Regions:
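N-terminal leader/targeting and assembly helices and adjacent pre-domain segments
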Residues: 1-14, 23, 27
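Terminal "cap-and-tail" regions of soluble proteins that handle hydrophobic small molecules
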Residues: 18-21, 166-168
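Short, hydrophobic/π-rich interface segment
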Residues: 91-145, 149-151
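Short, charged/polar micro-motifs that form catalytic or ligand-binding hotspots
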Residues: 9-17, 121-125
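Short, charged/polar, Gly/Pro-enriched secondary-structure boundary elements
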Residues: 111-114, 164-168
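C-terminal edge-of-domain segments
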Residues: 154-163
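Amphipathic interaction/junction segments at domain boundaries or subunit interfaces
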Residues: 19-25, 29-118
Length: 168
């Protein structure tokens, strides 16, 4: 996998870690050989990264104690958007930032492309779920709405809402 032309092509995006993504793809393909279904594979891979995610969750919970936690999340989103547009790893239909809300729709994603080339597009949900994991750990300040993602839909449409500013 790491010697393939596709790996070389995907390594050109600095905002993605192709080595890490390809390792996850290899794990998924290996688990597929045991006739596991997608949800079992996703659970197994996520369980393998549990220690790393626990640290990340703790950090997010600390951030959620800050009065400006939404602004921190907003800066992450804007920074991530700018990096990914610059390197071409994501193609946005739109990315709107307004007072207390970010809404975007992603039409093309290099992560999806990497998984799709191995016939396991649906397993890219492992990476799509990182947003959900992030925002569910900011419950005091952020409401995250995922309308769709690219692992099983035609776009990734998300809303990140400041709970203190917008009442729904």
């Amino acid at each position: 996998m790491y010697l393939s032309d596709n790996f070389k092509k995907h390594s050109k995006y600095p905002s993605t870690n192709a080595v890490h993504v390809y390792a996850v793809i290899a794990m998924c393909l290996g688990l597929k050989n045991f006739n596991l279904n997608d949800s079992q594979i996703i659970d197994d891979v996520n369980n393998g990264f549990e220690t790393r995610r626990k640290f990340f969750r703790r950090l997010l919970r600390c951030i959620d104690m800050l009065p400006n936690a939404y602004q921190v999340a907003q800066k992450w989103n804007i920074s991530d958007h700018d990096k990914r547009v610059k390197d071409g790893s994501l193609t946005y239909d739109y990315f709107n930032v307004s007072e207390g809300k970010i809404e975007y729709c992603i039409l093309k994603c290099v992560y999806i492309e990497m998984f799709e080339q191995y016939g396991i597009r649906s397993l890219c949900k492992i990476f799509c779920m990182t947003d959900t994991t992030s925002y569910e750990n900011l419950p005091k300040h952020v409401r995250f709405i995922r309308h769709s993602d690219l692992s099983d839909g035609s776009c990734c449409h998300d809303e990140v809402i400041d709970k203190r500013r917008i009442r729904e």
